[in-house]
Amino acid sequence: MDEIKTLLVDFFPQAKHFGIILIKAVIVFCIGFYFSFFLRNKTMKLLSKKDEILANFVAQVTFILILIITTIIALSTLGVQTTSIITVLGTVGIAVALALKDYLSSIAGGIILIILHPFKKGDIIEISGLEGKVEALNFFNTSLRLHDGRLAVLPNRSVANSNIINSNNTACRRIEWVCGVGYGSDIELVHKTIKDVIDTMEKIDKNMPTFIGITDFGSSSLNFTIRVWAKIEDGIFNVRSELIERIKNALDANHIEIPFNKLDIAIKNQDSSK
């Protein structure tokens, strides 16, 4: 009985002391957690005016770093030796780095993209044959909305090591199209017909150089290559479609043949008596 009383006498002060320490640690963690959210949102608000890609990436890094520091301080408040924590984290970090080297290289790739700044949110870019609008640069990956509506998520390490074509660095973009006409066509008439179509299209930038000329002798057609420039804001695909449609109608109106493959089938009658 005396032993139980002794245990209870020792337990309650210790429990009270540990409870106070635990409450302090929880308060420290809650404050740090709230502060990390506050600083992340503040960073997003300040930097998004300049560049949303930069703002999103820096905000994520800031949030994670403050959360790690807060966790270490909270554990230190509980009496855990921070030097031991750092040592363990270092050892675990090496093991994790070896196991997740691709993810770490993606983080490094994201930092490189932030420093070099080859694109920003909303830019139309082409990476490894994929073209679309940049939606976000995250901690590990870059989100690209393709023209058909699909979302491509590319690792930052791949993006940083790939050739990036940014179509938003210029107000105009060149449209190239090959049009085949019959070998018997009047070349000057074909040239004039196509030029008249281009001259009447308001969406074609007349200040940029235009090219219309024969570039190849096809198997069944003279191939004219047409190069014009259109404003990005007008929609390159829409302008190209309208240009092709107008040229087709103009060639038909001038009775200029557009060759196409034909298949002739010859049926030979055989004498059934043989």
From Swiss-Prot:
Q: Which cysteines are joined by disulfide bonds?
A: none
Cite the entry's keywords alphabetically.
Answer: Cell inner membrane, Cell membrane, Ion channel, Ion transport, Membrane, Transmembrane, Transmembrane helix, Transport
Topological domain ranges for the Periplasmic compartment: 1-21, 78-79
Query: Which residues lie toward the Cytoplasmic compartment?
Result: 45-56, 101-274
From the Swiss-Prot or TrEMBL record, state where the protein is found.
Cell inner membrane
* Primary role: Mechanosensitive channel that participates in the regulation of osmotic pressure changes within the cell, opening in response to stretch forces in the membrane lipid bilayer, without the need for other proteins. Contributes to normal resistance to hypoosmotic shock. Forms an ion channel of 1.0 nanosiemens conductance with a slight preference for anions.
What this protein is called in its record is: Small-conductance mechanosensitive channel
Look up and give the organism this protein is from. Helicobacter pylori (strain UM084)
What gene makes this protein? mscS
